[in-house]
């Protein structure tokens, strides 16, 4: 009779526990590893690369007003050596300088060359205006074999002023130019350093030569330094070029008595442009906004590992070749044994496995959403995604890449290492600063991605917990948590009942009476099982005590009757 009652109780217990609903999240067999603030190599369901490594080995110029300077150097467009004759005036928003380009024909250099190059790269092109200088008592047609066109010539935008006759007196002269335009004027002039004192006397007459230039913001005097130098282009002399930006309504004045290379036209900047030094081929079939010496970077990513000196609208250069940004939840691949041996897994882990946090295992079959339910009842088993929690997580994660780009995007300009001897210290400082910035941004990039990854994983876990709490609040005392993300329901719950739990329309009062009755039956079985264990342990303890007591009594009787003797030796 007792056996029959126990069997009935166990049958009721098993029947009640047959209905179950579990919460789970999407998983894949092979996820992507990302780093967070607290841990490296966490596997997530989805992730995207944030560091661009693909380079287009061409200058993509589609949609750009591009000028390829070829053999002409950018600074040469302002003074006009023969190789720059076609570029004395131009308009462009992309300026390409080639390695073969040269700024000068007669040997010499530009003062503060790199700053002027930067100004011209951003200029959008240049236009010119005649300065209106006229000269009497001097020749204005100085020329040299170093600047050949069809014959010896000179810079197209400059006048080489000479004495009227060899060794003749060069008169003291003063010339002024007022900028009547609304934008600054670029004014360039030169100082000629003859190859010898005799040559200087022949060209400009005897005596010391002095050139003074001034405006409201500038004043400088120059004295030529004649003397032998190594020949370049057949010339032992040198011409050094100087420049200033003349504000609107300001006037520049030149006072000189020889060795002066006079400007003929002032240059005005047209607008804005990008300038790049590259020997890469132009391609009108592709578009780009970020350029470097090796070509074009076309990317929507926030970082790049291609060239630290790219210019334009570019991703930030970082030292890392890869920084993965999590765009999905933490991945816990479904155990392969679960796929192959369902019955074994039911015995080992239950029907569904475990999920997020306390919910340890993911579901690879949950393809319609990030979160969902699996249930088991008399009608069978089923899986359904929860779209609301999925969308909530997606809405908060969407745009992470764009936010990273907003934090890092910047227009970059090219600062080269083409420094003269005087500027080398400045060049070293610029290079050191650039290297330091790269170090800082490499660290910042890693930190930013790690912060976003931490937020994504915490966020997706939070949505999972919200969903779990929603189900728990609905079921109340009608179900019991098993600690693995599942609820064992104490009443018959068909597919409509399961759907009401998922839809948040479950009425716990409707099933309360049945659930309480089944819970009492289950608790009774658990209670009987508990008493049985206590009795077992009590019986075992009592038996041991009784055995020891009998053994001690027998030993005492034997010793008393002389049948047993105890000898103690010291």
From Swiss-Prot:
A lipid is attached at residues 566, 569 (S-palmitoyl cysteine). Pfam families: Hemagglutinin. Residues 1-18 form the signal peptide. GO terms for cellular component: host cell plasma membrane; membrane; viral envelope; virion membrane. The chain crosses the membrane at residues 534-554. It comes from the Viruses. Gene3D superfamilies: 3.90.20.10, 3.90.209.20. Residues 19-533 are extracellular. The keyword Disulfide bond applies. Binds to sialic acid-containing receptors on the cell surface, bringing about the attachment of the virus particle to the cell. This attachment induces virion internalization of about two third of the virus particles through clathrin-dependent endocytosis and about one third through a clathrin- and caveolin-independent pathway. Plays a major role in the determination of host range restriction and virulence. Class I viral fusion protein. Major glycoprotein, comprises over 80% of the envelope proteins present in virus particle. The extent of infection into host organism is determined by HA. Influenza viruses bud from the apical surface of polarized epithelial cells (e.g. bronchial epithelial cells) into lumen of lungs and are therefore usually pneumotropic. The reason is that HA is cleaved by tryptase clara which is restricted to lungs. However, HAs of H5 and H7 pantropic avian viruses subtypes can be cleaved by furin and subtilisin-type enzymes, allowing the virus to grow in other organs than lungs. This is Hemagglutinin. It comes from Influenza A virus (strain A/Equine/Cambridge/1/1973 H7N7).
């Amino acid at each position: 009779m007792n056996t029959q009652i126990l069997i009935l109780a166990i049958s009721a217990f098993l029947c009640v526990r047959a209905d179950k609903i579990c919460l789970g999240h999407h998983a894949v067999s092979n996820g992507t590893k990302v780093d967070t603030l607290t841990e490296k190599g966490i596997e997530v369901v989805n992730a995207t690369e944030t560091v661009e490594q693909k380079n287009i080995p061409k200058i993509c110029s589609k949609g750009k007003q591009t000028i390829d300077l070829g053999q002409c150097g950018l600074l040469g467009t302002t003074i006009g050596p023969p190789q720059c004759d076609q570029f004395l005036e131009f308009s462009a928003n992309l300026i390409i300088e080639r390695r073969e380009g040269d700024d000068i024909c007669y040997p010499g250099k530009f003062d503060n060359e790199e700053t002027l190059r930067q100004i011209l790269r951003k200029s959008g092109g240049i236009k010119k205006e005649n300065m209106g200088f006229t000269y009497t008592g001097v020749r204005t047609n100085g020329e040299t074999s170093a600047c050949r066109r069809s014959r010896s010539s000179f810079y197209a935008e400059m006048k080489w002023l000479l004495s009227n006759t060899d060794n003749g007196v060069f008169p003291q002269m003063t010339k002024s130019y007022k900028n009547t335009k609304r934008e600054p004027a670029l004014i360039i002039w030169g100082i000629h350093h003859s190859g010898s004192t005799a040559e200087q006397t022949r060209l400009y007459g005897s005596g010391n030569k002095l050139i003074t230039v001034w405006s409201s913001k500038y004043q400088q005097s120059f004295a030529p330094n004649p003397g032998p130098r190594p020949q370049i282009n057949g010339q032992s002399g040198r011409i050094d070029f100087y420049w200033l930006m003349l504000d609107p309504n300001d006037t520049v004045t030149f006072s000189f008595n020889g060795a002066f290379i006079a400007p003929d036209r002032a240059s005005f900047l047209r607008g804005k442009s990008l300038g790049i030094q590259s020997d890469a081929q132009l391609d009108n079939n592709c578009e780009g906004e970020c350029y470097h010496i090796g070509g074009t970077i076309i990317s929507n990513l926030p970082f790049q590992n291609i060239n630290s000196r790219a210019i334009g609208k570019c991703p930030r250069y970082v030292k890392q070749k890869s920084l993965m940004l999590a765009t999905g939840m933490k991945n816990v691949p479904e155990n392969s044994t679960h796929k192959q041996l369902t019955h074994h897994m039911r015995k080992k882990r239950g029907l569904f496995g475990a999920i997020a946090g306390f919910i340890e295992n993911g579901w690879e079959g949950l393809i319609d959403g990030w979160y969902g339910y699996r249930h088991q009842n008399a009608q069978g088993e089923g899986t359904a995604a929860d779209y609301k929690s999925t969308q909530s997580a997606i809405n908060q994660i969407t745009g992470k890449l764009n936010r990273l780009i907003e934090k890092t995007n910047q227009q970059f300009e090219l600062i080269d290492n083409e420094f003269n001897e005087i500027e080398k210290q400045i060049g070293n400082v610029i290079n050191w600063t650039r290297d330091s910035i790269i170090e800082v941004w490499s660290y910042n990039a890693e930190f930013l991605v790690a912060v976003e990854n931490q937020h994504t994983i915490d966020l997706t876990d939070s949505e999972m917990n919200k969903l779990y709490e929603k189900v728990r609040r609905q079921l109340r005392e009608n179900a019991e948590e098993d600690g693995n993300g599942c609820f064992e329901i104490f009443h018959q719950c068909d597919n409509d009942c399961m759907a009401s739990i998922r839809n948040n329309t479950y009425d716990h009062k409707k099933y309360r009476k049945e659930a309480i009755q089944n819970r009492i039956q289950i608790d009774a079985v658990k209670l009987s099982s508990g008493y049985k264990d206590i009795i077992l342990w009590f019986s075992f303890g009592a038996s041991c005590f009784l055995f020891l007591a009998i053994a001690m009594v027998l030993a005492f009787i034997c010793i008393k009757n002389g049948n047993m003797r105890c000898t103690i030796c010291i």
